[in-house]
């Protein structure tokens, strides 16, 4: 297991799959399935996170009936209309202990890791922490 001095860069997933606010919900669903992920950062044209779209966001919106899902796809619903905002971010050099506390305090399953220019460079998920602990 990593020591208490380990930082976000030691555990995060690099080169995250990202979408833009104008991405269709259908495309976001396809990316989630294709890359076997449960959520991804939503970024602006400069790569700065503006939100997060997750399976939870999609399911909460689509739960009432299958007809809602069909209408949403037909209507061209966009990620920007469903994403969770703001994106909860963490600088790449943040100690893992601080990142874990931030995740708990914000009650989120993932943090968007940012560089010194505020651009998304990775994702740190609750699953990453579970894997770290399980691998001991």
Question: Where do the language-model regions lie?
Answer:
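A glycine-centered beta-loop-beta connector
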Residues: 32-35, 40-56, 103, 111-127
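The conserved cystathionine-beta-synthase
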Residues: 19-36, 43, 89-107, 114-115, ...
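Tandem CBS (Bateman) regulatory domains
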Residues: 1-15, 54-89, 95-108, 120, ...
